Design a protein with these regions (language model features):
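Short glycine/proline-centered loop/turn elements that form peptide/ligand docking sites
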Residues: 143, 147, 170-174, 191-196
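Conserved catalytic-core motifs of GNAT/GCN5-like acyltransferases
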Residues: 49, 164-167, 179, 184-200
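Active-site acidic-Proline motif in GNAT/NAT acetyltransferases
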Residues: 134-136, 140, 169-170
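GNAT-family acyltransferases
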Residues: 4-8, 16-136, 199-200, 204-230
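Conserved hydrophobic/aromatic "anchor" residues
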Residues: 49, 103, 153-155, 183
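Conserved acetyl-CoA-binding loop-helix of GNAT-fold acetyltransferases
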Residues: 139-153, 175-180
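Conserved GNAT acetyl-CoA-binding A-motif
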Residues: 156-166
Length: 230
């Protein structure tokens, strides 16, 4: 499964200003963003990236399903598996955008993928993405557990009103996962990216806090410790 983060502007400057503002006569409080937490589920742990995660990544070749999820822009810019992975892990451990959270997905003591949440502190919304690079572990409900953990933290701890994502229209496994977690189909970006076999559509999906509160699956809340790395 794979979904991707949209590009929100950094909110670092916004957090240095007033903690509230007015939109069309409505007073809103800017979200306060804590440090990256450790989120623990029944089978997976979401944590900060560690140097040894690069070895876990390199044990598993990039397969077509994973590559499709990254999109055509990633394929154009990719310059070697180790370079890309090390660059990604460095960015994840020391993000330039302080409104972006990136977790390594740990299962059975090894990193098997990553999940991300990019937050708009003014609009109380975030864009979510997840990818598992171990093909044999897809389809076992791990992506659903990761998604539920991040949604629980986003709504219950951050105080988000909305979480959104986009996914390749042909990725039926990922779409089923998101639907099971309460996300709703909101639209289509038609022929949004060019792939080797033609233009591809992307499905837009979203989950609102009231929908989550009345029926979306919940996972155990994260512990209060800081990010950990192996």
């Amino acid at each position: 499964m794979n979904s991707r983060l949209a590009h929100f502007p950094s909110n670092a400057a916004a957090r240095e200003q007033s903690s509230s503002y007015v939109v069309l006569g409505v007073m809103l409080d800017r979200l306060t963003l804590p440090a990256l937490p450790v989120l623990r589920g029944k089978r997976v742990i979401l944590r900060g990236s560690g140097e040894s995660d690069i070895d876990d990544r390199l044990r598993h070749p990039i397969d077509p399903e994973e590559e499709d999820g990254y999109g055509s822009s990633w394929r154009r810019e990719w310059d070697g598996r180790r370079y890309h992975t090390r660059e990604y892990l460095t960015a994840a451990r020391q993000p330039a955008d302080s409104s972006a959270y990136t977790w390594a997905v740990e299962y059975d003591g090894h990193c098997i993928g990553s999940a991300g949440l990019r937050v708009d502190v003014d609009q109380h919304c975030a864009t979510y993405a997840v990818g598992l690079f171990v093909a044999a572990l897809r389809g076992q409900g791990l992506g659903r557990e990761v998604t539920s953990l991040v949604a629980s933290w986003g709504f219950d701890v951050l105080g988000l009103h909305r979480i959104q994502l986009e996914v390749l229209a042909g990725n039926s496994r990922a779409i089923r996962c998101y639907l099971a977690c309460g996300f709703r189909h909101e639209g289509v970006r038609r022929e949004a990216e060019l792939y080797p076999d033609g233009w591809k559509d992307f499905i837009l999906m979203g989950l609102l806090q009231p929908e989550y509160a009345t029926g979306a699956p919940r996972s155990r809340l994260p512990d209060r410790g800081g990010p950990k790395a192996r």
